[in-house]
Every structure is written in C-alpha cells, then in structure tokens.
C-alpha cells in the first residue's frame, strides 16, 4: 500500500500580537477504493497577546497573557491493505476429490473510508512577576467519527472462522464514534533565581 498528500499552510501576524494560521491537507491512501481514496482535513488557529496591548501597560506584574484557540482535523487509515479486496487462501494437506481446498480469507468492504478526528482547543497562557510564575489554562474537546473497527459477520456470510483464523469471521468497517473533553491546568514557579535556581 502507499499514501500521498498535499499540504498548504498560511501564517499571519499583525502588530506582533494578533496571530492567525490555517492549513489544508489532502491525503490519499491505496487502502481505499477510488471513490473513498482521498480525505480532506482542515485546521485553523488564532492567538491574541493581550499583554502587549496599551491598556495592559500598567499591569507590571503580568509578563505574558495570551489567549489562543484552534480547530483541527486529522485522518486515520491504520487498517490492513486488503480491507477493500476479497482474498483467498489454500488449505495445506486438505483435499476434496483430489483437489486442494481454497477458502475466503477476507471479505471486502469497498465502503471503508477515512476515519476522521476533530479537535478544539481553547487556552490562556500566562507569565507573572518577571516570568517567575508561568503556566496555562486550557479546554479541549476531541471527536472521532467513522471509526475503523472490526465488526462481526453473521454465520450466513459463509466464512465463519474459515481456516481456523478467528479474525476472518469479521470485517473492517466505519462503525462508531468517540467523544471526550476536559480541562488542563499547568503552573510552573521559580522560587529562587540568584546564584542557583530552584524550580517547583
């Protein structure tokens, strides 16, 4: 199997405190059929360095205050290369009417496509007292859709446990989704900064 991709990215900074970025990725994988071969994934990010604004000049104890946010998409095609193809195997030392047996090893799923991951991140980075205290507060949200997983095939498919392989009575397919979110907090404190440095 092989993969190929096209990538574009733009970054823009205005007055050294307004930040904007965007990217586009188009990925292709030979693991999928022609109709589903490509996946398009976008991302955008922005930032505002609040501490550089004129109204923050009297807040001398604030070394840095930055608001940031981003949205991004990525794809996953971590599946065997034969998912969209029927494959067969020959049973060794097993014959019927002097002919060696052949059985269906993998049943094709031509509808398989890219799994997509979407993420949203919002955060506030800070540094206080001449960078003696710094850290971040962030919220994240992750969503995975069209998850690539094995699904059990019914006995009527005719390949239940063919050849003694427990995996080939199932098929890779886009089934299910996953969602999680949460908050992250980070703080670093420099307690002493003279002849030696003590971090906590």
Locate the predicted segments by residue.
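Extracellular/periplasmic, surface-exposed regions of secreted and cell-surface proteins
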Residues: 1-200
């Amino acid at each position: 199997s092989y993969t190929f991709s096209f990538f574009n990215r733009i970054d823009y900074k205005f007055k050294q405190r307004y930040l904007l970025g965007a990217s586009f990725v188009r990925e292709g994988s030979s693991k999928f059929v022609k109709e589903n071969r490509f996946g398009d994934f976008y991302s955008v990010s922005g930032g505002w360095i609040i501490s550089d604004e004129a109204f923050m000049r009297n807040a001398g104890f604030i070394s840095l205050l930055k608001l940031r946010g981003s949205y991004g998409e990525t794809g996953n095609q971590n599946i065997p290369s034969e998912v969209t193809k029927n494959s067969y195997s020959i049973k060794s030392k097993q014959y019927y009417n002097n002919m060696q047996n052949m059985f269906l090893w993998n049943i094709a799923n031509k509808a398989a496509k890219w799994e997509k991951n979407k993420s949203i991140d919002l955060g506030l980075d800070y540094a206080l007292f001449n960078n003696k205290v710094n850290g971040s507060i962030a919220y994240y949200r992750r969503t995975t859709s069209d998850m690539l997983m094995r699904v059990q095939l019914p006995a009527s498919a005719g390949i239940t446990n063919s050849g003694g392989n427990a995996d080939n009575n199932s098929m890779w397919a886009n089934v299910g989704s996953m969602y999680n979110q949460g908050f992250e907090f980070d703080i670093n404190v420099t307690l002493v900064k003279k002849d030696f440095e003590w971090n906590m």
